[in-house]
């Protein structure tokens, strides 16, 4: 038997919100979903009037909903923002080439300028070629590091004031779990921050969907009939995040509020003053923000170009030994060639 919408609008409920358990009609769900994101933007002071904001666009559900809602709220509440789409082409055949077509559709639907940057033009490599070198055990490390820096490079080219990413509540809860399991206190400190970066040397990133459940994002996209790309990356099944995601889904079955509980716990964490803190600086090679010298992207790229794809995987000391060994082998080879030429 149909039940009434809890918002008492007079309509029958069409869905049950995963976040609150409320039975709502579609229109009231849209209103509640959009109002929560507006509250997140305003209460966290994510933007200022007149700013130029790049919406990180992959063509997936999160970035598509983010672009749609940002445009909607910008017009409804007169934020006064100049919105553009920024997309990164990692060079994954059968995945990114198809999803970029969706991004182009978003560009046309939302009337936003679009900038696409590729790994090939930035680094001289595609993910297809990287996976052929490294295999499928550490490929997500390369992709994640290169994509983060590629977004910074794109933002700098576009001259934007901030980058809005589609990270949702599920993503952030997963990241908290991953950092706890890895003992990564440096990332655990900042992974729940709604704004990261900023300052004179970097462009800040913001997460308007920080408190939005993934299930509600999917429902919103479905009922709004938004065009998005839903195929999983062909290289993702072996990613470490997948284990955290499966664990989180199991917890959610027992306790539906676990996603928000984990985020709130992460926000309240405090660390001893003796805990090691990474020092942000500028990479001496590429000129982008880094907490190490050279930055992780430059180390990974050096490894690929040297024929040592595992150079940036693991501890820095291990990478230094690999470089020293290769330099020694090259020196011996060069010396052997000199002796050969003498005869």
UniProtKB/Swiss-Prot annotation:
The keyword RNA-binding applies. GO terms for cellular component: cytosol; cytosolic tRNA wobble base thiouridylase complex; mitochondrion. One of its GO terms (biological process) is tRNA thio-modification. It is an enzyme of class 2 (transferase). Its main location: cytoplasm. Its EC number is 2.7.7.-. Transmembrane segments: none annotated. InterPro entries: CTU1-like_ATP-bd, CTU1_C, Ncs6/Tuc1/Ctu1, Rossmann-like_a/b/a_fold, TilS/TtcA_N, tRNA_thiolation_TtcA_Ctu1, UPF0021_CS. It holds the Pfam family ATP_bind_3. Keywords: Cytoplasm, RNA-binding, Transferase, tRNA processing, tRNA-binding. Pathway: tRNA modification; 5-methoxycarbonylmethyl-2-thiouridine-tRNA biosynthesis. It is found in: Cytoplasm. GO terms for molecular function: nucleotidyltransferase activity; tRNA binding. Belongs to the TtcA family. CTU1/NCS6/ATPBD3 subfamily. Plays a central role in 2-thiolation of mcm(5)S(2)U at tRNA wobble positions of tRNA(Lys), tRNA(Glu) and tRNA(Gln). Directly binds tRNAs and probably acts by catalyzing adenylation of tRNAs, an intermediate required for 2-thiolation. It is unclear whether it acts as a sulfurtransferase that transfers sulfur from thiocarboxylated URM1 onto the uridine of tRNAs at wobble position. This is Cytoplasmic tRNA 2-thiolation protein 1. It comes from Drosophila grimshawi (Hawaiian fruit fly).
């Amino acid at each position: 038997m149909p039940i009434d919408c809890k918002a008492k609008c007079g309509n029958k409920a069409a869905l049950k919100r995963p976040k609150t358990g409320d039975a709502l009609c579609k229109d009231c769900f849209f209103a509640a979903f959009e109002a929560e994101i507006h509250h997140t933007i305003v209460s966290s002071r994510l933007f200022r009037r007149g700013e130029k904001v790049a919406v990180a666009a992959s063509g997936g559900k999160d970035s598509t909903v983010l672009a749609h809602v940002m445009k909607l709220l910008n017009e409804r509440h007169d934020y006064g923002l100049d919105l553009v789409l920024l997309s990164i082409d990692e060079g994954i055949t059968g995945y990114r080439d198809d999803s970029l077509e969706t991004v182009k559709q978003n560009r046309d639907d939302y009337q936003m300028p679009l900038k696409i940057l590729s790994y090939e033009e930035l680094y001289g490599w595609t993910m297809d070629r990287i996976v052929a070198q490294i295999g499928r055990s550490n490929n997500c490390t390369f992709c994640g590091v290169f994509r983060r820096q590629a977004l910074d490079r794109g933002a700098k080219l576009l001259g934007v004031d901030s980058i809005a990413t589609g990270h949702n509540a599920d993503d952030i809860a997963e990241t908290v779990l991953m950092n706890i399991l890895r003992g990564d206190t440096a990332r655990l400190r900042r992974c729940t921050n709604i704004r990261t970066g900023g300052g004179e040397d970097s462009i800040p990133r913001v997460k308007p969907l920080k408190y939005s459940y993934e299930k509600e994002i999917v429902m919103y996209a479905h009922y709004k009939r938004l065009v998005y790309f839903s195929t999983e990356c062909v290289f993702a099944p072996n990613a470490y995040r997948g284990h955290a995601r499966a664990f989180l889904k199991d917890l959610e079955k027992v306790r539906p509020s676990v996603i928000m509980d984990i985020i709130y716990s992460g926000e309240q964490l405090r660390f001893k003053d003796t805990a090691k803190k990474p020092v942000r600086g500028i990479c001496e090679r590429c000129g982008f923000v880094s907490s190490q010298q050279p930055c992780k992207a430059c180390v990974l790229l050096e490894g690929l170009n040297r024929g040592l794809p595992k150079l940036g995987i693991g501890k820095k000391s291990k990478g230094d030994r690999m470089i020293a060994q290769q330099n020694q082998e090259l020196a011996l080879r060069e010396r052997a060639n000199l002796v050969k030429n003498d005869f």
